[in-house]
């Protein structure tokens, strides 16, 4: 696994380094990229909500400038995280995904949810602290399952109304309180498409910063039942033969990895590399 990007708790009082600028799920970018000289950004007097030390990219320190409102910077524009997925290398996307999660967490914890007092970053750890009542919050992580259901040479794929036209993907959903991830897999498959599965096999995981999911990937074999798409959640679901697949999710997604991995094992091809 690449070590170009390494998360670390850096002290914002340190000088120099690079910075990414984030606001409302978008990053500032110019013709040179998304990393800006930090000292140059400081001179712009941006509407800074918080500055967070993120870690190191290619050995250089990287910081996050989380803005209160978007700012106009000559020669730069704002761009959403999903666009970067197709444009930058996986290590830089991991950095941006981490920055998104930290920035979202900071912006959503400006005030204490218990007493309403302003919250402050706690020195020495990634935490927001309320000095008035002592409540402490860490970055949020939402565990989610994603599963490829198969029946021999057939893959059960579905599409949400939110997908790009023609794209089908694997099934996914959030883990509910009190259930295991395996229980979540069986429940979500039953809810979304109405079929039963054999016990699922864990494959791999991927951080999914939209804005703070951890995708736990599984494969499950079909056990029985007819496909009945869940109203409002699933626009269409059907079995696809491996020789006649529809448009699939982006290659950087774990959904695509689960599909490509099954095809490789079924057809005796080299296995794909897990996306960062």
Curated annotation (Swiss-Prot):
Residues the entry annotates as binding a divalent metal cation 1: 172, 192, 233
SUPFAM superfamilies named among the record's database cross-references: Nudix (SSF55811)
Residues engaged in binding Zn(2+): 112, 115, 130, 133
Cofactor note: Divalent metal cations. Mg(2+) or Mn(2+).
Alphabetically ordered keywords of this record: Hydrolase, Magnesium, Manganese, Metal-binding, NAD, Zinc
Family (UniProt): Belongs to the Nudix hydrolase family. NudC subfamily.
Protein name: NAD-capped RNA hydrolase NudC
Source organism per UniProt: Stutzerimonas stutzeri (strain A1501) (Pseudomonas stutzeri)
Primary gene name: nudC
């Amino acid at each position: 696994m690449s070590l170009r990007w390494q998360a670390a708790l850096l002290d914002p009082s340190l000088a120099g380094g690079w910075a990414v600028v984030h606001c409302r799920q978008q990053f500032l970018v110019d013709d040179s990229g998304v990393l800006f000289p930090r000292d140059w950004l400081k001179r712009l007097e941006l509407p800074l909500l918080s500055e967070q030390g993120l870690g190191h990219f290619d050995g250089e320190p990287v910081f996050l400038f989380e803005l209160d409102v978007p700012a106009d910077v000559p020669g730069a524009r704002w761009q959403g995280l999903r666009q970067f997925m197709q444009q930058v290398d996986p290590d830089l996307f991991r950095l941006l995904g981490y920055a998104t999660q930290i920035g979202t967490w900071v912006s959503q914890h400006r005030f204490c949810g218990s007493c309403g007092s302003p919250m402050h970053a706690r020195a020495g750890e990634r935490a927001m602290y309320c000095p008035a009542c002592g409540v402490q919050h860490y970055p949020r992580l939402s565990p989610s399952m994603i599963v490829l259901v198969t029946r021999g040479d057939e893959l059960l794929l579905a599409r949400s109304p939110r997908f790009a036209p023609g794209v089908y993907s694997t099934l996914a959903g959030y883990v509910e309180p009190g259930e295991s991830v395996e229980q979540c897999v069986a429940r979500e498959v039953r809810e979304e498409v109405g079929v039963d599965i054999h016990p699922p096999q864990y494959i791999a995981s991927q951080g999914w910063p939209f804005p703070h999911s951890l995708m736990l990937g599984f494969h499950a074999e079909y056990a029985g039942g007819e496909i009945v798409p869940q109203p409002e959640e699933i626009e269409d679901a059907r079995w696809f033969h491996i020789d006649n697949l529809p448009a699939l999710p982006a290659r950087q997604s774990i959904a695509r990895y689960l599909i490509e991995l099954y095809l490789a094992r079924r057809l005796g091809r080299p296995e794909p590399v897990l996306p960062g």
